[in-house]
Amino acid sequence: SNPSSMELQDLIAGGRLVHTAMADLAVRLTDKEQLVGKSGWSAIGAVVGATHPEDLKSLREKYPNIFFLVPGYGAQGGKAKDVQYAFDRFGHGAIVNSSRGIMCAWKKTEDATGRNYQAAEQAEAERMRDDICRYVTIL
């Protein structure tokens, strides 16, 4: 979700992309320290931006046991159809974050005073959930 992230994450280190090297390290640490719990998910996760759906898809395929935090949905341009790739076939394995989209939802209300920010935030969080659930089935 950070436009300049490629300046570091897409550098080549040891013959591979830095972001791939980091994910490989997470897998090695998970295996070495036996950090996969009963759920099947590693205790070590990765942050993968919603605005890079092609990366979400390839990283989910390559790292099926790494939990993803997915920032960038909403205000930063990530869409529900993009974040669907962060989840496994059961709709598990990711948390989609939309801080600004939810915190600033009151600005889109009729009075835009912020007096009813809680209702606006709840409505936006529910809209986000429903939007994502159009693309992700949770089993």
Where are these regions (language model features)?
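Conserved anion-binding
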Residues: 1-45
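Glycine-rich, positively charged active-site loop/lid region within alpha/beta enzyme cores that binds
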Residues: 2-10, 96-97, 101-102, 106-108
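Short, low-complexity, polar/charged sequence segments that are solvent-exposed and flexible
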Residues: 14-18, 65-68, 87-90, 114-118
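Surface-exposed amphipathic alpha-helices with a cationic face
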Residues: 27-31, 38, 59-63, 129, ...
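Structural alpha-beta junctions
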Residues: 31-33, 66-69, 139
